[in-house]
């Protein structure tokens, strides 16, 4: 008689599995290429009826089962399995390079190790009979997965043969119900004895005690069959037969191939010859899955064409950032960055560059505020605009810039708001309700965002956002340009920051200053009475992108610092030598960066908060809290009002008195006898 032939098991990795594998590799494994366990399910074969050309003409067609690996392969708790499916555990190895994946010796070692583990399990009461191995290389950038499944099967020697034909099984529903009640989805094969309705079941490891040897009961094995062929059982039976023969000395048995519907079959099997009495040798094992072409070679799953382009873009944006955590900065908190809501006040040169770099860091929520339109001089310096945006008087900058951001990356939530910012020294009428509405709208925007960028082209336009940012405790990053110089700074966070002590250096208890803390005069109208070269932004073209990049990097460093907005000022020397855990993984978090292109130099500067500052002092904040817009109206209309509120006018008078008192001193008398 010819040896029994088995139908190979087919793998069925789902798109959800590849997505889960990519996420697990990117977010958890990173460079770790250790093999790890995964779960899958074996689904049995079934037969279905299909209609032919005539309505009353049908055919019975067999469909093979398979090993299905789904999106829950990495989860300890699996969802509900289909009826008659069996849960199995396998080994996954994700290689870091395609060259490692192609190395045949590495795959052979993994296969041999899995076979050894299976043989060792035969000495326990829970033999592993359905192991599988998956080796893969994931090209996460192109969404291409090279993979190869193996289903190790031990070769029985002598071979098993059929004693007759496979026949239909009576009482199959009783057997199926018994399998569900005893083993649920955890066992692919079990022992059976008795007749309905008095059937009994037991695990294979109980073979020596389950049957009554005095009555010469025939061993009956039920296994979930993945083959739909009439005379060829599925691949999983090979290990069952080897185990029963090698471990329990079984030389003949009845096998019931449990399949879907009414297609289950049974047959009597026996060894073709008595087992050898020679010393046992390690059994031969086979099981690498063949390519659809019939060759023993890996397969490729290309998910790129199947994926939504928008989702592809989102995953690609995150990919480069997550790769930073693999080797360079494992402590980088990308979720904190992506969840930060950024408000950009100014959609000009600085605003365009800042927005682009924020998207590069994975920031998903960006709001741009501007009141101007795109002019013909803008597109060459402001990368979010094109020539067509300048036509017919020009499109509004903020909504246009937001639209361009979404064209670059559809996953960004970009909003554009046309809004003018009221400024000190720019009077408003007493009946101008629109200004009050603009103030309320601006405050609502500041309140609803986490970080505020001041990117306007005048000094006084930054005053109101400075006040609002301090009031609501936001991270405020300021960037200003000169012809060949720039300033990038973050504002202090208020009273809370002043109480923070920093042992490794930085400013003292007063906290960090704001844009106006070095001024001894209130901001005033700097836009009127200017020549053309003063009205236009005249600066070296490379200064803006440099300043914009530093502004964004400063924000990211603040977000990564354990103290966040309250992070004290650091210098490179203190950040490198500090043993404190309260540092940013990105390095030092400075207060101010002052750059000069003429000298190719950038300086780190620290500035304490000024208690009479016109932008962030308690005098200003308390006055705004008390009088609201009435206070702002006086600031806009009265040139010296801020100086009175903060006490700068008294400081002037005291200084003048000191100077007057020093006029009578003889400075040349020092040292005379």
Swiss-Prot record:
UniProt keyword ATP-binding, yes or no: no
Stretches for region Disordered: 268-293
Pfam families hit by this protein: ATG7_N (PF16420), ThiF (PF00899)
Renumbered ranges of motif GXGXXG motif: 346-351
Quaternary structure and partners: Homodimer.
GO terms for MF: Atg12 activating enzyme activity; Atg8 activating enzyme activity; identical protein binding
UniProt protein name: Ubiquitin-like modifier-activating enzyme ATG7
Sections of the chain in a coiled coil: none
Species of provenance: Cryptococcus neoformans var. neoformans serotype D (strain B-3501A)
Cell compartments where the protein resides: Cytoplasm; Preautophagosomal structure
Lineage, highest ranks first: Eukaryota, Fungi, Dikarya, Basidiomycota, Agaricomycotina
Function (record text): E1-like activating enzyme involved in the 2 ubiquitin-like systems required for cytoplasm to vacuole transport (Cvt) and autophagy. Activates ATG12 for its conjugation with ATG5 and ATG8 for its conjugation with phosphatidylethanolamine. Both systems are needed for the ATG8 association to Cvt vesicles and autophagosomes membranes. Autophagy is essential for maintenance of amino acid levels and protein synthesis under nitrogen starvation.
UniProt entry keywords in alphabetical sequence: Autophagy, Cytoplasm, Protein transport, Transport, Ubl conjugation pathway
GO CC field: cytosol; extrinsic component of phagophore assembly site membrane
């Amino acid at each position: 008689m010819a040896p029994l032939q088995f139908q190979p098991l087919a793998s069925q990795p789902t798109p959800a599995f590849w997505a889960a594998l990519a996420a697990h590799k990117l977010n958890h494994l990173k460079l770790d290429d250790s093999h790890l366990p995964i779960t899958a399910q074996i689904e049995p074969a079934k037969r279905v009826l299909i209609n032919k050309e005539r309505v009353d003409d049908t055919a019975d067609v067999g469909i093979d089962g398979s090993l299905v690996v789904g999106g829950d392969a990495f989860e300890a708790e699996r969802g509900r399995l289909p009826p008659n499916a069996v849960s199995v555990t396998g080994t996954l190895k994700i290689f870091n390079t395609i060259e490692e994946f192609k190395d045949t010796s590495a795959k052979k070692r993994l296969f041999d190790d899995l076979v050894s583990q299976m043989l060792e399990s035969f000495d326990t009461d829970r033999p592993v009979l359905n192991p599988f191995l998956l080796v893969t290389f994931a090209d996460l950038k192109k969404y291409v997965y090279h993979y190869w499944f193996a289903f190790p099967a031990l070769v029985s020697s002598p071979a098993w043969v059929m004693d007759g034909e496979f026949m239909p099984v009576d009482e199959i529903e009783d057997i199926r119900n018994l399998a569900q009640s005893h083993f649920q989805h955890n066992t692919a094969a079990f022992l059976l004895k008795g007749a309905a309705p008095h059937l009994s079941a037991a695990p294979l490891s109980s073979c020596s005690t389950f049957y009554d040897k005095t009555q010469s009961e025939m061993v009956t094995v039920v296994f979930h069959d993945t083959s739909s062929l009439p005379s060829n059982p599925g691949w999983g039976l090979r290990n069952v037969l080897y185990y029963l023969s090698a471990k329990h000395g079984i030389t003949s048995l009845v096998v019931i191939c449990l399949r879907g519907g009414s297609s289950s079959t049974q047959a009597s099997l026996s060894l073709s010859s008595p087992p050898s009495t020679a010393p046992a040798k390690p059994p031969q094992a086979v099981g690498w899955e063949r390519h659809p072409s019939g060759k023993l070679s890996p397969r490729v799953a290309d998910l790129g064409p199947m994926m939504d382009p928008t989702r592809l873009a989102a995953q690609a944006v995150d990919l480069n950032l997550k790769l930073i955590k693999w080797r360079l900065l494992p402590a980088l908190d990308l979720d904190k960055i992506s969840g930060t809501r950024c408000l950009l006040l100014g959609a000009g040169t600085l605003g365009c560059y800042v927005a682009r770099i924020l998207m590069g860091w994975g920031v998903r929520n960006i709001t741009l505020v501007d009141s101007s339109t795109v002019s013909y001089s803008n597109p060459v310096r402001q990368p979010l605009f094109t020539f067509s945006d300048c036509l017919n008087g020009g499109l509004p900058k903020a909504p246009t810039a937001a639209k361009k951001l979404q064209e670059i990356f559809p996953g960004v939530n970009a909003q554009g708001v046309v809004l003018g910012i009221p400024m000190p020294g720019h009077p408003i009428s007493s009946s101008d309700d629109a200004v009050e509405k603009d103030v309320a709208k601006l405050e609502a925007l500041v309140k609803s965002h986490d970080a505020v960028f001041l990117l306007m082209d005048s000094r006084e336009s930054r005053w109101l956002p400075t006040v609002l940012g301090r009031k609501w405790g936001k991270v405020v990053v300021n960037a200003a340009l000169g012809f060949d110089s720039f300033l990038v700074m973050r504002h202090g966070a208020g009273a809370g920051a002043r109480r923070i002590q920093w042992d490794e250096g930085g400013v003292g208890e007063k906290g960090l200053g704001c844009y106006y803390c070095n001024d001894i005069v209130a901001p005033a109208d700097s836009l009127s009475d200017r020549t053309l070269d003063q009205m236009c932004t005249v600066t070296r073209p490379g200064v803006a992108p440099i300043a914009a990049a530093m502004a964004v990097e400063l924000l990211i460093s603040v977000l990564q610092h354990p103290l966040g907005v309250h992070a004290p000022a650091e210098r490179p020397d203190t950040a490198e030598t500090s043993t404190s855990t309260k540092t940013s993984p990105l390095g030092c978090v400075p207060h101010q960066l002052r750059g000069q292109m003429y000298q190719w130099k950038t300086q780190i500067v620290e500035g304490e908060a000024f208690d009479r500052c016109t932008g962030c002092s308690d005098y200003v904040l308390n006055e705004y809290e008390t009088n609201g817009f009435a206070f702002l109206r006086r600031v806009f209309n009265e040139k010296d009002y801020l100086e009175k509120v903060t006490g700068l006018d008294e400081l002037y008078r005291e200084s003048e008195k000191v100077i007057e008192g020093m006029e009578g001193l003889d400075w040349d008398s020092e040292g005379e006898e």
